[in-house]
Amino acid sequence: MKLEIEIEHWPDGEWESITGGAAKATRDVEPALAHARLETSVLFTSDEQVHVLNREWRERDKPTNVLSFPMLDRDRLRALEPEGPPEMLGDIALAYETCAREAEEKGISLEAHATHLIVHGLLHLAGHDHVDSDAQAEEMEALEIAALAKLGIADPYGDRT
């Protein structure tokens, strides 16, 4: 998978490397993402920009930590032939202020939280969801936990009772 990364309104950091590591770990747990023809863009931006995107595309008038915009449905992704032109999997946008606040509240690094949200976003682009049923949510969370474990990042859901 080819990654296009744009960084706006985030502090200096190893965001390209973090994104690449998150993508590799996610490909390891979701083989459909291992396709060489896939392209994904990841935007590190502000709460203000994510608020605009959330309002325009999801009709939710507030910022959120991560948004994903899939461009291939799950069946088409799984049927993708090895040869052919690049295919845009979708876009991911992360909101700095929300991500930083959540990381502080959880007592984890911004890098670890951003990694989790990139994994989460990539799984959404691959057709996974957590809204329709508890079973779907559990499946998606298990993939997130497995991908993050490959990177040495603790289970982000481990504090639930």
Swiss-Prot record:
Q: What is its main location?
A: cytoplasm
Q: Name one GO cellular component term.
A: cytoplasm
Describe how the cofactor binds: Binds 1 zinc ion.
Q: Which cofactor does it need?
A: Zn(2+)
| Pfam families the UniProt entry points to | YbeY (PF02130)
Top EC class of this enzyme: hydrolase
Lineage, top-rank taxon, reads Bacteria
* Endpoints of the signal sequence: none
EC number(s) stated in the UniProt entry for this protein: 3.1.-.-
UniProt keyword terms in alphabetical order: Cytoplasm, Endonuclease, Hydrolase, Metal-binding, Nuclease, Ribosome biogenesis, rRNA processing, Zinc
List the Gene Ontology MF annotations in alphabetical order.
metalloendopeptidase activity; RNA endonuclease activity; zinc ion binding
Q: Which residues bind Zn(2+)?
A: H120, H124, H130
Task: Quote the PANTHER family the UniProt record gives.
Answer: ENDORIBONUCLEASE YBEY, CHLOROPLASTIC
Q: What does this protein do?
A: Single strand-specific metallo-endoribonuclease involved in late-stage 70S ribosome quality control and in maturation of the 3' terminus of the 16S rRNA.
Q: What is this protein called?
A: Endoribonuclease YbeY
Q: Which organism is it from?
A: Erythrobacter litoralis (strain HTCC2594)
